Design a protein with these regions (language model features):
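N-terminal compositionally biased, intrinsically disordered segments and leader/signal-like regions
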Residues: 13, 27-30, 62, 67, ...
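Glycine-rich, low-complexity segments
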Residues: 1-32, 74, 136-144
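Generic short beta-strand segments
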Residues: 22-26, 49-55, 112
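Sterically constrained small-residue positions within well-ordered secondary structures
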Residues: 30, 39, 60, 97, ...
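Beta-rich globular "head" domains
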Residues: 32-92, 136-142
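Conserved, charge-rich beta-strand/loop surface module that forms ligand/interface-binding patches
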Residues: 76-144
Length: 144
């Protein structure tokens, strides 16, 4: 397989190689936390990986923590990716992502006595976010 350069990515990379990007965060205070944000493009398809780990001065505020995409999407989509929300105590929760043309919102799946349903992620849902808690997003989408 030969490599080919993809124009207008903001970084020089061969097709299929991972590229780091710096997303804009909303309802997330980075503080001394860490972000891993990378993607790779093959044709019009983007594979994205994002992980945020809270430090002692980090926080989740408001509802639906959000980060910007590295390249705008061709479509808006609901539940087009999967998220894992990890509490420092070892508990893990299944999350979902909703995408606009330029951003990703993080939600969580919640169970009641009968159903599993989607809920808003916030400073206290699915747990109260503290140091070493994290969320990881894996998703694919199509660019314009």
């Amino acid at each position: 397989m030969s490599s080919k350069l993809i124009p207008n990515l903001g970084a020089t990379s061969a097709a299929g190689n991972w590229v780091n990007w710096t997303p804009t965060l909303t309802n997330i205070t980075l503080g001394n936390g860490t972000v891993i944000a990378k993607y790779r493009q093959t044709g019009k398809s983007i594979e994205l990986f994002f992980r945020f780990t809270l430090g002692s001065t980090s926080s989740i505020t408001g509802s639906f923590p959000t980060f910007t995409l590295p390249i705008n999407s061709a479509y808006e989509s609901y539940a087009n990716g999967i998220a894992t929300l990890s509490d420092a105590n070892g508990s893990k929760f299944l999350g979902w992502v909703w995408m606009s043309a330029s951003s990703v919102w993080l939600g969580v799946s919640v169970a009641n006595a009968t159903y599993v349903y989607d809920s808003t992620t916030s400073a206290t849902v699915p747990f109260t976010w503290t140091s070493t808690d994290s969320f990881t997003v894996s998703m694919n989408y199509e660019v314009v």
